[in-house]
Amino acid sequence: MNRLLQQSVSRGPLAVRASSTITTKPPTPNQITKNNAQFDKVTHTGQAWDQSDYRLQRFDISKKSVNPNVAMHLIDQRPPEDCGDKRVVFCDGGHPALGHPKVYINLDKPGVHACGYCGNRFYNSHATKAEDMKIQHLNC
């Protein structure tokens, strides 16, 4: 009995401390309009919820961690690789131990061709002129 009493007394202050960290109550969904909506950080999938969304309650206790270095932004910073006059190139992702299969990419059409697995971009300098660099192809 004494042990049960000690456990219940020790749990009381912890519950008070945890609940005292919540300072303000978010607005209800019917109070949110397009003009006053405040969105949380956008994730790599493009998800962002307004402040009244019930899915944000998991971040009341801990902070939401979002990596700003999204892979598609990092790959976009790499310039396309000039493959000279080659009509077909392959992309293996750089190292076979990374799990990237060998993907063959046809470069006959003018424009930049991206690997569907990793996003690396290639172009044929013979078929692609400067004005054609805006054309994007995705090869899966």
UniProtKB/Swiss-Prot annotation:
Gene3D superfamilies: q5lls5 like domains (2.60.260.40). Pfam families: zf-CHCC. One of its GO terms (cellular component) is mitochondrion. It is found in: Mitochondrion inner membrane. Keywords: Electron transport, Membrane, Mitochondrion, Mitochondrion inner membrane, Respiratory chain, Transit peptide, Transport. GO terms for biological process: mitochondrial electron transport, NADH to ubiquinone; response to xenobiotic stimulus. Its main location: mitochondrion. Accessory subunit of the mitochondrial membrane respiratory chain NADH dehydrogenase (Complex I), that is believed not to be involved in catalysis. Complex I functions in the transfer of electrons from NADH to the respiratory chain. The immediate electron acceptor for the enzyme is believed to be ubiquinone. Complex I is composed of 45 different subunits. This is a component of the iron-sulfur (IP) fragment of the enzyme. Belongs to the complex I NDUFS6 subunit family. This is Probable NADH dehydrogenase [ubiquinone] iron-sulfur protein 6, mitochondrial. The gene is nduf-6.
